């Protein structure tokens, strides 16, 4: 649920994280650092960001240490950048502010051109806050966990690009749900419901909802439809056939799943706290990002 903060003491130490693989990211990041420092805040850069853009005037720390020293993290990039740092900060008391320097920007919802107007007030303690859930998943082979990871958006089991459909047996809370022949299956958080799950035909879940959504990817049976399940459910996806299937945890991948492998997915106890400008509204974000308020013109442009 989104809540408005009362006036509190300003955040003292601000961590900066950037989409350092993007062209021309150094100048806006350094501009942002100067703006924040000029208002009396201490600055620390995420280490990979600092190394890749050549930061020398500010200290740099790896994400785990950054979480211990910073009071808030400001992410300049797209949603993918925020997903990555969000996993590192999950469970820590460091909230995250997203400034868009990517494309769509559902979570990095502050346009860079507006940052000088809204960020000072947010760092001074005036913001809207919400808590987002994550997924915890393990890959189990012969009763041994061979891989585990957190996912902010989704856990996706995919067929190989060189083979046909993958066959999956899906159970929820120990109860068999179905066998499925498809290109894969998405297990999504409410946050991830506006990502891959949406493009695969899944519903949008408001972030305040306590639920998970299972979305088949191009299922062979048209009756295999998306389903929303309780947030505390445990989902087990067993690969029954299919060559070189893979599983993706947001942007982290494990390839070459074997028949018999089980992917166990449940809601993580860790959460991420996102901060937005005062007046933030989720429905306005959907309307803007998905162009709900626009209609095609005669030349088929929005």
UniProtKB/Swiss-Prot annotation:
InterPro entries: ATP-NAD_kinase_N (IPR017438), ATP-NAD_kinase_PpnK-typ_C (IPR017437), NAD/diacylglycerol_kinase_sf (IPR016064), NADK (IPR002504). Involved in the regulation of the intracellular balance of NAD and NADP, and is a key enzyme in the biosynthesis of NADP. Catalyzes specifically the phosphorylation on 2'-hydroxyl of the adenosine moiety of NAD to yield NADP. NAD(+) binds at residues 79-80, 153-154, 181, 183, 194-199, 218, 252. GO terms for biological process: NAD metabolic process; NADP biosynthetic process. This is NAD kinase. HAMAP family: NAD_kinase (MF_00361). The keyword Ligase does not apply. Keywords: ATP-binding, Cytoplasm, Kinase, NAD, NADP, Nucleotide-binding, Transferase. Its EC number is 2.7.1.23. It comes from the Bacteria. It comes from Ralstonia nicotianae (strain ATCC BAA-1114 / GMI1000) (Ralstonia solanacearum). Its cofactor is a divalent metal cation. GO terms for cellular component: cytoplasm. GO terms for molecular function: ATP binding; metal ion binding; NAD binding; NAD+ kinase activity. The gene is nadK. The keyword Protein biosynthesis does not apply. Belongs to the NAD kinase family.
